[in-house]
Amino acid sequence: MGGSDENRHGVIGPMNRQQGGLRGGKVIPTNGQTRRALSNINKNIIGAPVYPCAVKRPFTEKNGICNKKIPPVPVHRPVTRKFAAQLAENNLQIHKEETKKPDLISNEALDRIITDVEEGDFNEPMFVQHTEAMLEEIDKMEGIEMQDSNDIDAEVEESVMDIDSCDKNNPLSVVEYINDIYCFYKKNECRSCVPPNYMENQHDINERMRGILFDWLIEVHYKFELMEETLYLTINLIDRFLAVHQHIARKKLQLVGVTAMLLACKYEEVSVPVVDDLILISDKAYTRTEILDMEKLMANTLQFNFCLPTPYVFMRRFLKAAQSDKKLELLSFFMIELCLVEYEMLQYTPSQLAASAIYTAQSTLKGYEDWSKTSEFHSGYTEEALLECSRKMVGLHHKAGTGKLTGVHRKYNTSKFGYAARIEPAGFLLL
């Protein structure tokens, strides 16, 4: 270096045996100057940082009083650990600010750059890729959550209750195949139906006489305290017999009714009324022989087929699906017994009559149309499919206490049947 000669190679002189007999060589500087002080060694190192040193400046009154901004004078001080950390932190902040400053590039230059660079040659920074991946994942999660919430809402709205879960430990409920049993009933209920105009083939009786007979049989059934199944089977046997045997005299119509009740009692009841009781209830209009002969004729005509689904079979299942209480149950049976007397209601199947009776009773008690998904599932009928039949039931409810055929109204106007006949009809269903 120009300012120091201490790094230049010296010359080793020859051995001078005369001067003290030195065995080693002596380093002779070329310029004869001695080595500089050690304190200035930093100047001789290439690229070495300059050590700061404190420079004291005198304090002037002018500088202390004046409000003018005086450019700061660089202070040279020894580098301690704390001071070095501050310097490193300042350099880091400056570096961050420089990286944040966008490069000003003209549009033409930018276009050229974008045109020249291919998509596959440019890699996005890792933090950008991670951010995009996180956003995509969040979007997916939000989509899944929205879909799950929609599915949950749909499940809540369209959920069908397991109405047989409470009877799993009851072997008499046959929970394992109860649904198969009712599917079989639905398929075979058409066999228990009769043509809705079969009275046109009768020569001596009509639908009004049929209604009188059924209204009387409902009172007889109530006085004998028979099972509900017996009443519905009695009505079914009479209609099926009259639909096939087309030459029944008017004076024999009551005999057909009494005999049908006897057959139904033998099929359903544990304790069957004796023939003499039936003769007495018919005011001794028929003899024992006539009743037994009609019994044989009816059994042969119907081919001993008494096991067919009636509206009562479906009523029990549909009431369970509707989670009915006693009030709803009594009003539903009141509705459907009104239909038994009416000839025009033969156009509906037993299952449709049962579902319509429950739907009408629910709407009557609640004051609005009500038909749950569970009831729809187990009955197989939507609310729209029941409206026509339900409106006719409301009409029958309106006139139940009027006219000559009031047996059903008197029966359900007692405390035993919860005074169901006194409930106001659901007139809003007629609108």
UniProtKB/Swiss-Prot annotation:
GO molecular function: cyclin-dependent protein serine/threonine kinase regulator activity
A biological-process GO annotation: mitotic cell cycle phase transition
Region (Disordered): 1-30
InterPro entries hit by this protein: Cyclin (IPR039361), Cyclin-like_dom (IPR013763), Cyclin-like_sf (IPR036915), Cyclin_A/B-like (IPR046965), Cyclin_C-dom (IPR004367), Cyclin_N (IPR006671), Cyclins_cyclin-box (IPR048258)
Pfam families, sorted: Cyclin_C (PF02984), Cyclin_N (PF00134)
Keyword hit for Methyltransferase: no
Keywords: Cell cycle, Cell division, Cyclin
Sequence similarity: Belongs to the cyclin family. Cyclin AB subfamily.
Quaternary structure and partners: Interacts with SMR11.
Protein name: Cyclin-B2-4
Source species of the chain: Arabidopsis thaliana (Mouse-ear cress)
Taxonomy of the source species: Eukaryota, Viridiplantae, Streptophyta, Embryophyta, Tracheophyta
Gene name of the record: CYCB2-4
